[in-house]
């Protein structure tokens, strides 16, 4: 328990000192507690101090990981905390009741709009500003707007002017007609202030403030000073919660040397509820990566597609991607790009979170590689790992794959696929297959004077490991590169120097790296084998009378056209259970295919 907390504390000491929110999670990734902080590192470190309340002690016993979202200000962190708690309802947080969020300013969608305070968003085309954490200051600003601009307060039409009209605070729209243009001017003035255009108003307040001080009217001076403070505070650009009913995702790509970080900031009902960090190796250009990511991310089975997807890339054609997502998911989402003051602030937050996520990701990879180095008794960090796997279907079309990982991340530019030639048709010999793949790969590296990997991973057990090592030894590079194997049954790691095997706990970062390499090699080998088989069956289907099932039978029970050549028509008929006429056509096809290949080889 103490060791786990010590490890977690080490990660906390590397957190940023900026403002933001943090999520404490248990071993099942369930969120236990959400908090905010002006200084994330300092606040989270306080949970590890000896003097803790009983409740915090219980909480910390269950905390296995901590995630953070950075913000541009403490104010944004406060609002974000509220939204996250409402969304996730963690066990250790106070449960906020629905409808009791922070207040907003609403400009109603009416002939003569009213300006009101509200805690609920109504989908009636009203305009909303906020929310605002300081209710007192919000009330002061509303009072200022109502007294400065002639906005109606009455809800119903009247036959006589109200008190506000007589006080000069209303145009009298409750009983007068045709005041739309004049009234809209007053509304626009109020909107201008709420949109942050307050410099002129502040100048006027400063003049009045000086006059009040000169007259020693300190009561008025205090009110004017409070009003100035309120206007400044509520007109801070608020980017964590945007008061509208849209569900919108902001997708930002942060390019890196070895890996790109893709951050998705998710707003639901106008509220930021989640930061999703994704990582991809740096092969594609930025615009290509964004388009590929959008397709893979938003067409996945469990992904809810928002109303709009905002990308931070200009002049990228997203029409086809948008159409594809909408067709697959039966939605009407829009992929957009805009440049506004508010969106630039969101981009700043996305960049901050992307950098943080990348640091966390790289720290995890480095620690995992350090562990792997120790377990495998290596002198150097396994920065470059090459993984091998063999695939076949009952000895047919045996192939090998070689994948490369750099710093724990796939490096696809370096992948290799091998069609193996050392095995006879139908022969299953993984050891000989491994030998051929290793020989071809490392003979090429030696001849071309390329860089050797730090570690070679073989999918298999002791036999496969010995086969690979024998080739490395024959090439005289057995001392220059470490080789190990990973057996699927118990995920046991075998070394030449330790054939008893190493069994790491499931989920161990070092084991996970090896599993990722093994699984990627497995995926590539199986994909190549399948592609080879599909190519052959496609050829067989050109034969008159051969469909998919018969083509599969020929491949499975006989093999390629070369395997057909030595067989008689009767043997073909008997092996795949077809009539003699079809067997004859199959034989003729094989002879023709062979002659074409021979002509091609002579050219």
Curated annotation (Swiss-Prot):
Looking at the record, the residues that make up the UVR domain are: 199-234
Q: Where in the cell is it found?
A: Cytoplasm
Q: Where is the signal peptide?
A: none
**Which PROSITE patterns does UniProt cross-reference here?**
GIY_YIG (PS50164), UVRC (PS50165)
Q: Does the keyword Phosphoprotein apply?
A: no
Xref: InterPro entries: GIY-YIG_endonuc, GIY-YIG_endonuc_sf, GIY-YIG_UvrC_Cho, RuvA_2-like, UvrABC_protein_C, UvrC, UvrC_RNase_H_dom, UvrC_RNase_H_dom_sf
Q: Name one GO cellular component term.
A: excinuclease repair complex
List the keywords (alphabetical).
Cytoplasm, DNA damage, DNA excision, DNA repair, Excision nuclease, SOS response
- Under the GO molecular function aspect, what terms does this record hold? DNA binding; excinuclease ABC activity
- Report any one BP term from Gene Ontology: SOS response
Q: Where is the GIY-YIG domain?
A: 17-94
What PANTHER family does its record include?
UVRABC SYSTEM PROTEIN C (PTHR30562:SF1), UVRC/OXIDOREDUCTASE (PTHR30562)
Q: Give the record's family classification.
A: Belongs to the UvrC family.
Described purpose of this protein according to its UniProt entry: The UvrABC repair system catalyzes the recognition and processing of DNA lesions. UvrC both incises the 5' and 3' sides of the lesion. The N-terminal half is responsible for the 3' incision and the C-terminal half is responsible for the 5' incision.
Assembly mode: Interacts with UvrB in an incision complex.
**Name of the protein this chain belongs to:** UvrABC system protein C
* Species per Swiss-Prot/TrEMBL record: Borrelia garinii subsp. bavariensis (strain ATCC BAA-2496 / DSM 23469 / PBi)
């Amino acid at each position: 328990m103490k060791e786990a907390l010590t490890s977690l504390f080490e990660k906390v000491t590397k957190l940023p000192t900026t403002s933001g929110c943090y999520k404490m999670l248990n071993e099942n990734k369930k969120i236990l507690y959400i908090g905010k902080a002006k200084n994330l590192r300092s606040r989270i470190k306080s949970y590890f101090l000896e003097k803790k309340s009983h409740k915090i002690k219980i909480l910390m016993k269950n905390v296995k990981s901590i995630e953070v979202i950075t913000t541009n200000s403490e104010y944004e962190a406060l609002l974000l905390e509220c939204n996250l708690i409402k969304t996730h309802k963690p066990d250790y947080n106070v449960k906020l009741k629905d409808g009791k969020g922070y207040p907003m300013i609403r400009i109603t969608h009416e002939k003569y709009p009213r300006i009101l305070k509200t805690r609920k968003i109504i989908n009636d085309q009203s305009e909303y500003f906020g929310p605002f954490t300081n209710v007192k200051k919000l009330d002061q600003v509303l009072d200022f707007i109502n007294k400065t601009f002639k906005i109606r307060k009455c809800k119903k039409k009247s036959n006589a002017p109200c008190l506000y009209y007589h006080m000069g605070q209303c145009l009298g729209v409750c009983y007068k007609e045709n005041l739309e243009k004049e009234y809209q001017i007053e509304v626009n003035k109020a909107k201008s202030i709420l949109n942050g255009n307050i410099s002129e108003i502040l100048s006027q307040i400063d003049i009045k403030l000086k006059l009040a001080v000169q007259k020693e009217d300190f009561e008025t001076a205090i009110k004017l000073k409070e009003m100035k403070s309120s206007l400044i505070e509520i007109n801070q650009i608020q980017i964590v919660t945007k008061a509208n009913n849209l569900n919108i995702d902001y997708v930002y790509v942060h390019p890196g040397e070895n890996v790109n970080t893709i951050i998705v900031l998710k707003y639901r009902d106008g509220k930021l509820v989640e930061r999703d960090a994704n990582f991809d190796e740096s092969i594609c250009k930025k615009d290509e990566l964004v388009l590929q990511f959008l397709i893979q991310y938003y067409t996945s089975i469990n992904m809810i597609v928002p109303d709009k997807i905002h990308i931070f890339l200009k002049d990228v054609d997203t029409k086809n991607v948008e159409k594809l997502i909408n067709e697959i998911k039966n939605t009407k989402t829009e992929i957009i790009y805009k440049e506004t003051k508010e969106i630039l602030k969101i981009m700043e937050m996305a960049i901050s979170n992307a950098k943080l996520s990348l640091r966390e990701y790289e720290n995890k990879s480095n620690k995992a590689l350090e562990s792997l180095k120790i377990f495998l008794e290596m002198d150097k960090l396994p920065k470059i790992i090459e993984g091998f796997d063999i695939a076949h279907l009952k000895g047919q079309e045996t192939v090998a794959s070689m994948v490369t990982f750099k710093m724990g991340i796939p490096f696809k530019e370096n992948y290799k696929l091998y069609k193996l030639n050392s095995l006879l048709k139908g022969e299953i010999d993984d050891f000989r297959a491994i030998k051929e793949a290793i020989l071809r790969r490392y003979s090429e590296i030696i001849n071309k004077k390329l860089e050797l990997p730090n570690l070679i991973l073989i999918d298999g057990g002791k036999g496969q490991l010995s086969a690979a090592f024998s080739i490395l030894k024959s090439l005289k590079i057995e001392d220059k590169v470490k080789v190990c194997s990973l057996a699927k049954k118990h995920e046991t790691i075998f070394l030449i120097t330790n054939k008893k095997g190493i069994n790491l706990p499931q989920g161990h970062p070092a084991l996970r790296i090896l599993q990722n390499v093994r699984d990627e090699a497995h995926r590539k080998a199986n994909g190549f084998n399948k592609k080879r088989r599909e190519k052959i069956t496609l050829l067989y289907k050109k034969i008159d009378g051969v469909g998919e099932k018969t083509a599969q039978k020929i491949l499975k029970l006989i093999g390629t056209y070369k395997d057909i050549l030595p067989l008689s028509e009767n043997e073909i008929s008997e092996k795949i259970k077809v009539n003699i006429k079809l067997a004859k056509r199959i034989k003729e096809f094989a002879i023709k295919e062979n002659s074409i290949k021979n002509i091609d080889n002579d050219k």
